[in-house]
């Protein structure tokens, strides 16, 4: 009898495997890592860190593919998103984004004006942070092969603040959130569901390096940092808890959620903690520096609502990661959400697919 190589429970790949939640983790753990895991330089991070020649600095690199629908949305488009997304992944490793590559998969019949508008948007974001384009590629596919336009990007940057890792949480660390959550996911949901909101709700899509740069140049102890994209804040915190085998306690009252986002969540029965963001990051930092770090973030428009939302209450000395799907069963690796009355519940790792093609 042929030995089964994986424990993956599906014969075909479900849509939920692209959610950034438990199903994504399962796909990576059971299909990709058994074959490719030994080759990974930086497993579990949004960007890999490597050395190049005689350079005194390390470099961070991240690749990402963008398939959002619709390709134009309130607050941005797929072009802006592709630059912000890759740039932010590199910045989360304490690096300054410097170079980017672009790959365009274009559906036959896409309007010239639509494509040009997206290219102009890319140019605007590249110029904003002085990124340099190393290489680019275009493919045009027969109508129906894809939906309008997909973009792949790879970003490279020089590491200015080393040691940042989801495995580096320490007991007592303060958890900082840079901005209100859920705006990107809620705005895309509202657009697709045809919810007519008389408000300013729009995606928070933005490059975060400029806001974070002052932290990279100082003696700040940033142990972990992640932008809360697919799976939202819930996915980030649960990934950290799993990687560091830590218990994280979050104060629900300290998490800022715009009223428009709350409204969409109530209408559609969503949890804001699980909604995607494209201009929000979480940090786990040395407790004695947390207030100063918050003040620095608040000095930038993108971080004006930065706040301490919780802390790391326990860290296992073994740091042996468990399955993300079983966080709630583990005595250490879990995220606990405390409400204003003092009641506590687990902030669950996202299950299923809330919204396909969110980024």
Regions found by a protein language model. Give the residues of each.
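Glycine-rich phosphate/pyrophosphate-binding loop regions near the starts of catalytic domains
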Residues: 14, 22-177, 183, 188, ...
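Acidic, Ser/Thr/Pro-rich beta/coil linker or hinge segments at domain junctions
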Residues: 300-359
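Short, ordered loop/turn segments at secondary-structure junctions
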Residues: 18, 65, 105, 137-139, ...
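N-terminal amphipathic/basic leader segments beginning at the initiator methionine
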Residues: 1-31, 330-332, 347-355
């Amino acid at each position: 009898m042929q030995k089964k190589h994986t424990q993956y429970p599906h014969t075909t790949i479900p849509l939920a495997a692209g959610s950034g939640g438990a199903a994504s983790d399962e796909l990576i753990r059971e299909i990709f890592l058994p074959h490719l895991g030994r080759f990974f330089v930086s497993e579990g991070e949004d960007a890999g860190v490597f050395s190049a020649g005689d350079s005194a600095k390390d470099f961070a690199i991240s690749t990402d593919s963008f398939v959002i629908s619709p390709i134009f949305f309130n607050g941005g488009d797929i072009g802006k998103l592709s630059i912000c997304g890759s740039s932010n992944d590199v910045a989360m490793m304490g690096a300054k984004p410097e170079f980017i590559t672009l790959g365009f998969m274009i559906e036959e019949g896409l309007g010239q004006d639509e494509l040009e508008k997206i290219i102009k948007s890319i140019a605007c974001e590249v110029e904003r942070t002085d990124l340099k384009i190393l290489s680019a590629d275009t493919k045009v596919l027969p109508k129906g092969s894809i939906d309008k336009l997909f973009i792949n990007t790879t970003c490279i940057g020089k590491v200015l603040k080393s040691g940042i890792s989801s495995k580096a949480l320490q007991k007592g660390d303060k958890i900082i959130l840079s901005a209100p959550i859920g705006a990107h996911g809620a705005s895309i949901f509202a657009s697709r569901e045809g919810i007519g909101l008389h408000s300013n709700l729009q995606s928070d899509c933005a490059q975060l390096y400029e806001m974070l740069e002052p932290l990279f140049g100082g003696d700040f102890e940033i142990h972990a940092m992640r932008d809360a994209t697919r799976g939202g804040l819930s996915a980030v915190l649960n990934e950290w808890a799993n990687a560091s085998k830590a218990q994280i306690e979050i104060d629900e009252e300290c998490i800022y959620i715009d009223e428009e986002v709350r409204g969409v969540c109530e209408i559609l029965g969503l949890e804001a903690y699980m909604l995607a963001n494209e201009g929000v990051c979480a940090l786990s930092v040395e407790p004695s520096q947390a207030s100063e770090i918050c003040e620095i973030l608040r000095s930038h428009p993108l971080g004006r609502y930065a706040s301490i939302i919780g802390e790391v209450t326990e860290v296992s000395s073994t740091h042996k990661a468990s399955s993300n799907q079983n966080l709630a069963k583990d005595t250490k690796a879990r995220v606990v959400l405390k409400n204003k009355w003092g009641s506590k519940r687990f902030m669950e790792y996202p299950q299923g697919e809330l919204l396909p093609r969110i980024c």
